[in-house]
C-alpha cells in the first residue's frame, strides 16, 4: 500500500472538541485528570479555559463532576487514559453515569497495548468488556482520524452515555473525509470477498485491509468489515458477512475475552452458527516496549490475520 498520512486518534479527539466549541456549541465542556497534554484536550483548554476543568488525579470524582454537569444541561467530555477512565473509575461510571443514563461522553485515550513503553499498568485491554457490560452504554472505537472526528461529533449529537476509545499511536488515515458517512451502530464494508470475512475495529481495521490485499495476491478474497461501534453491534452486517463467506476472523486490540470477538460470536452462535477465530490479546497482560514491536509480538498485525485465514481455509 502507498504511504499515507498517519495521525493518532487522540489528536483527532482534541481537534474535534475545539472545532465543536468554535462552532458555537456552548453546552460542551471538557474535564481532564491532569493529562490534558497526553489526551490532547490541552488545545481546548488553551482556547476555552473557562470550559475546561482539570480534576486532578481523581478519576472517580471527575466522573461524578461530569454527571452533575450533565444534569444542568451541559454535555461533558470526560478525558483520561482508558486504564483510568474505564478501570479505576468503573464504579462511578456505572453508578453515577450509566445507572441514571446521563448525557456524559467519556474520551478514553491510550487504549490497548500500543501505549508502548508505559507497560502493562497503563495498557488497558479490558475496557470494551467493562464498558459493554454497562446497560445503555454506547461503545465506539474509531479506526483513523476521519472516523474519530466523525465519532466525536456523533457522540456529541446523541443523547446518553458514550465511551470513545482513542489511541496513542499515529495510524494511517485511509478514509476519504469528503465521502465518509458515520452512523453509530452501523458497520462499514471496506472490501468485497466471499472466501473469508475479517471483522475488525480500531487500528486493526487497517491491518485487516493490508491482510486482505496480501490474501488477494494469493487468490483468497477476504471481505473486510469495519466495526467502529462495539455496542450496539451492527448485527445485520455481521450476519451478512458470515452468510456470504462462511468463515469469520475478528481482529481487535483488546483481550479476546469480552471484546468485539465475543460480541460477534454471541450473535452468530444464536442466529447463524459460523466458524470464528479471534485475533486479539490472548488473555495476557501487556509489557513495555515500542508500540509496533508489541503489536507484532502479540499477534495484532496483518501477518497474524493472514496466518489465521490460511488455517481456517486449509491453505
Can you annotate each of these PLM segments?
Residues 1-165, 170, 181, ...:
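Thiamine diphosphate
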Amino acid at each position: 500500500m502507498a504511504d499515507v498520512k498517519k495521525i493518532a486518534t487522540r489528536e483527532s479527539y482534541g481537534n474535534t472538541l475545539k472545532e465543536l466549541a468554535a462552532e458555537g456549541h456552548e453546552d460542551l465542556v471538557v474535564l481532564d485528570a491532569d493529562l490534558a497534554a497526553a489526551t490532547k484536550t490541552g488545545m481546548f483548554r488553551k482556547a476555552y479555559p473557562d470550559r475546561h476543568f482539570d480534576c486532578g488525579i481523581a478519576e472517580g470524582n471527575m466522573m461524578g463532576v461530569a454527571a452533575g454537569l450533565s444534569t444542568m444541561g451541559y454535555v461533558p467530555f470526560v478525558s483520561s487514559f482508558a486504564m483510568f477512565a474505564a478501570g479505576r473509575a468503573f464504579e462511578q461510571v456505572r453508578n453515577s453515569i450509566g445507572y441514571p443514563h446521563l448525557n456524559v461522553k467519556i474520551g478514553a485515550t491510550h487504549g490497548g497495548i500500543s501505549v508502548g513503553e508505559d507497560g502493562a499498568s497503563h495498557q488497558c485491554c479490558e475496557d470494551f468488556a467493562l464498558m459493554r457490560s454497562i446497560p445503555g452504554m454506547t461503545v465506539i472505537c474509531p479506526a483513523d482520524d476521519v472516523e474519530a472526528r466523525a465519532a466525536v461529533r456523533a457522540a456529541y449529537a446523541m443523547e446518553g452515555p458514550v465511551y470513545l476509545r482513542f489511541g496513542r499511536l499515529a495510524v494511517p488515515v485511509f478514509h476519504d473525509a469528503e465521502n465518509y458517512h458515520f452512523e453509530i451502530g452501523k458497520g462499514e464494508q471496506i472490501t468485497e470477498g466471499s472466501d473469508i470475512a475479517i471483522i475488525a475495529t480500531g487500528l486493526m481495521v487497517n491491518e485487516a485491509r493490508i491482510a486482505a490485499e496480501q490474501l488477494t495476491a494469493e487468490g483468497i478474497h477476504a471481505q473486510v468489515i469495519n466495526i467502529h461501534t462495539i455496542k450496539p453491534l451492527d448485527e445485520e452486517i455481521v450476519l451478512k458477512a458470515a452468510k456470504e463467506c462462511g468463515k469469520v476472523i475478528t481482529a481487535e486490540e483488546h483481550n479476546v475475552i469480552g471484546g468485539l470477538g465475543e460480541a460477534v460470536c454471541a450473535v452468530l452462535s444464536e442466529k447463524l452458527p459460523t466458524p470464528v477465530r479471534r485475533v486479539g490479546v490472548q488473555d495476557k497482560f501487556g509489557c513495555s516496549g515500542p508500540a509496533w514491536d508489541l503489536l507484532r509480538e502479540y499477534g495484532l498485525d496483518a501477518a497474524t490475520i493472514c496466518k489465521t485465514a490460511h488455517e481456517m481455509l486449509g491453505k
